[in-house]
């Protein structure tokens, strides 16, 4: 009986592994039709009795402002071009910070955030962390860095029910994702840790200070030259 159960478990795991590889491989070229986070937001709105219409328009890489690409990297994951999905230094720093009793600090890379947004539910558990690591590894192995950032910019939430760069640009600044200025991009990047509480178009003093810091980091990263290096940094 035990051997039968173990065989069933192994078979299920193999099917899951093969299926997830296939899905991630397809999404290397095909825009995701939606994300787990979008489904979660929809369900939350129904449960609360206040259904919302999600705002989202997919924009390809070359129709998203380079300013926004650099701003997001500057604010969220400055080692994006270097790591394979996990920033070990940031993880260690977050663990030390949290052990000292400070406010909870995360250390998720852009690749990890893509994994969570696309495939996983909110919350904290060992199962979810394990699945996040699995999908992050697949994304890093099967996608280019450019593709990871493209999917991130089209799936991240920028306000209640507002997903992706184009919807965010329209919602906050009444412009297109391709036309975002350095200042606008820095404000969008500044709210990403908490986009449902902070506003890019009506920023608090903290968000304004964070946006200023992000603009400094953008200059230090090198702007367009950084993106050119990002495009050529991939293994295959």
Swiss-Prot record:
This is Biosynthetic peptidoglycan transglycosylase. HAMAP family: PGT_MtgA. It is found in: Cell inner membrane. GO terms for cellular component: peptidoglycan-based cell wall; plasma membrane. It catalyses: [GlcNAc-(1->4)-Mur2Ac(oyl-L-Ala-gamma-D-Glu-L-Lys-D-Ala-D-Ala)](n)-di-trans,octa-cis-undecaprenyl diphosphate + beta-D-GlcNAc-(1->4)-Mur2Ac(oyl-L-Ala-gamma-D-Glu-L-Lys-D-Ala-D-Ala)-di-trans,octa-cis-undecaprenyl diphosphate = [GlcNAc-(1->4)-Mur2Ac(oyl-L-Ala-gamma-D-Glu-L-Lys-D-Ala-D-Ala)](n+1)-di-trans,octa-cis-undecaprenyl diphosphate + di-trans,octa-cis-undecaprenyl diphosphate + H(+). GO terms for biological process: cell wall organization; peptidoglycan biosynthetic process; regulation of cell shape. One of its GO terms (molecular function) is pentosyltransferase activity. PANTHER family: BIOSYNTHETIC PEPTIDOGLYCAN TRANSGLYCOSYLASE, MONOFUNCTIONAL BIOSYNTHETIC PEPTIDOGLYCAN TRANSGLYCOSYLASE. The gene is mtgA. InterPro entries: Glyco_trans_51, Lysozyme-like_dom_sf, PBP_transglycosylase, Pep_trsgly. It holds the Pfam family Transgly. Keywords: Cell inner membrane, Cell membrane, Cell shape, Cell wall biogenesis/degradation, Glycosyltransferase, Membrane, Peptidoglycan synthesis, Transferase, Transmembrane, Transmembrane helix. Its EC number is 2.4.99.28. Peptidoglycan polymerase that catalyzes glycan chain elongation from lipid-linked precursors. It comes from the Bacteria. SUPFAM superfamilies: Lysozyme-like (SSF53955). The chain crosses the membrane at residues 12-31. It is a single-pass membrane protein. The keyword Membrane applies. Pathway: Cell wall biogenesis; peptidoglycan biosynthesis. Belongs to the glycosyltransferase 51 family.
């Amino acid at each position: 009986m035990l051997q039968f159960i173990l065989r069933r478990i192994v078979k299920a795991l193999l099917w899951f592994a093969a299926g997830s590889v296939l899905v991630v491989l397809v999404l290397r070229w095909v825009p995701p039709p939606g994300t787990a986070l979008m489904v979660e937001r929809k369900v939350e709105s129904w449960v609360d009795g206040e259904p919302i219409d999600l705002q989202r328009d997919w924009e390809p890489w070359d129709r998203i402002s380079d300013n926004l690409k650099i701003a997001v990297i500057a604010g969220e994951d400055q080692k994006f071009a270097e790591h394979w999905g996990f920033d070990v230094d940031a993880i260690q720093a977050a663990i030390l910070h949290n052990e000292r009793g400070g406010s909870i600090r995360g250390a998720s890379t852009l690749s990890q955030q893509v994994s969570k947004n696309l495939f996983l539910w909110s919350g904290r558990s060992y199962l979810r962390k394990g699945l996040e690591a699995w999908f992050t590894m697949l994304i890093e192995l099967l996608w280019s860095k450019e593709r990871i950032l493209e999917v991130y910019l089209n799936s991240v939430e920028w306000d209640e029910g507002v997903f992706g760069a184009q919807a965010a640009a329209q919602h906050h600044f009444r412009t297109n994702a391709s036309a975002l200025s350095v200042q606008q991009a820095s404000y969008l990047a500044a709210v990403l840790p908490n986009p449902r509480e902070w506003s890019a178009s009506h920023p608090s003093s903290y968000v304004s200070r964070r946006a200023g810091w992000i603009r400094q980091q953008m200059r230090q990263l090198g702007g367009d030259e950084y993106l050119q290096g990002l495009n050529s940094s991939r293994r295959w």
